[in-house]
């Protein structure tokens, strides 16, 4: 088994200051991993950690430098285009990217998304929707969804409350209802478990073949009982493992996952199989 983490932020040591600054400015109770063997590191250090933990691929949010929202500048924690390009070139197959689309730029933003999706490292787009105060069914997103439908790539979005001081209502999972109907072949991943609207997120994943639930940002001990039960039974083909690193460390999350005692089939689907179905551009695994 080779783990795929569907959502990480930039992991370079210099990004620690950006997290510290954002937390200090907003005064929010958000923590990031600080232990040296599970926190920020350089590319070679992350690959060594991935090899140790059995992780095949990290999917990294990647975007341009621009301010998002009133208090939070999300771009400070994502990879830059050139960083993603360098990671992908130096460590083929280990790092791929989700383009952090900006719906405020109109057609220029759509063209930038199109340019990003033409890159070898791109496997989909990411919507940090709270930064833009737009629900998932906002008209500004539809051209980006259409590009993803054309390119057969996934859309990942932070669902639920915002970790920063931004409007949370726009992250309600029910907002995916109309886009999932309009783009039936496009995979949509409701990240962050949809908390506090977990039942609503699960309902969307149950209703639509193309809607999935992602666990990023919450370590397994903090998953709602509903998420655990969904992953174990009705949603075994619908739940993706993620960390939103550095808010959750890989070593930390994988150790806690063992405590839930999922059977082998559920574990394989959550850690790898479901992600490989959602992200069709992931490197194909060699079968020995």
Residue ranges with predicted function:
Residues 4-13, 128, 158, 192:
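Histidine-centered divalent metal-coordination motifs
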Residues 7, 50, 84, 125, ...:
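Conserved, mostly hydrophobic/aromatic
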Residues 41-50, 105-116, 198:
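Short, acidic/polar
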Residues 56-57, 62-66, 70-157, 161-163, ...:
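Active-site gating/metal-coordination segments in enzymes
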Residues 120-124, 134-240, 286-287:
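Catalytic pocket-lining loop regions of alpha/beta-barrel enzymes
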